[in-house]
Amino acid sequence: MALKDKQKWDEKYKNNPAPDKPVKLITDFAKLSSGTKALDVACGMGRHSKYLASIGFDVDALDISYVAIDSLQGIPHIYPKKVDFDTYTFPIDHYDLIICTYFLKRELFPKITEALKEGGIFIYETFLYHPDNENAPSNRSFLLEEGELELTFDHKYEIMHLSEYWDEDQQGAKTMKAAMVAKKKSGGMGDEDFGA
């Protein structure tokens, strides 16, 4: 990611209060993991890392923002690290649970899958394109397309939960979102499975 991205997120985290309540998808499904080694991709200020640590996970919390990562230093069972996702190398077959919310970088899908142990759980939630969205990123490449999660993951994951739904924020703005909980099957996926 460019220096511009890092600066943008540093400013956002300095000047805007971050949500502190974990999304329901994570509180509902994280406990399905059979192990306790977790990865929080693009963790932001760490609401999900903190939740996972509170229920017994050891969490690698990754983000491009120094502000975000510094806020997580010293919290038991959270191991924050500032990374550039354009160049970061994920460990192979390392995590029992990987979560990612409101960050879409399709090139990471095969890397995330390789980092997940066989039988590991991937929990993902982000914005979905819809022409009537009132509060979503304006850059279409930052939005999933309808049916994209199922098309991308169905052939090598056991999809345990999949939904595309309208959500309303605190100001009443409506936005389409997509959510998935999937269990990595034996054999996993490689770059070729993602069209890379």
State each model region's role.
Residues 168-196:
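Core SAM-dependent methyltransferase catalytic element
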Residues 1-33, 35-44:
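Conserved class I S-adenosyl-L-methionine
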Residues 65-67:
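Conserved SAM/SAH-binding beta-strand->alpha-helix loop
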Residues 75-87:
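Conserved SAM-binding strand-loop segment of SAM-dependent methyltransferases
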Residues 120-131:
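Conserved beta-strand signature within the Rossmann-like core of class I S-adenosyl-L-methionine
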Residues 90-97:
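A short acidic, Gly/Pro-enriched loop at the edge of an enzyme's catalytic core
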Residues 58-63:
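Conserved SAM-binding motif I beta-strand of class I
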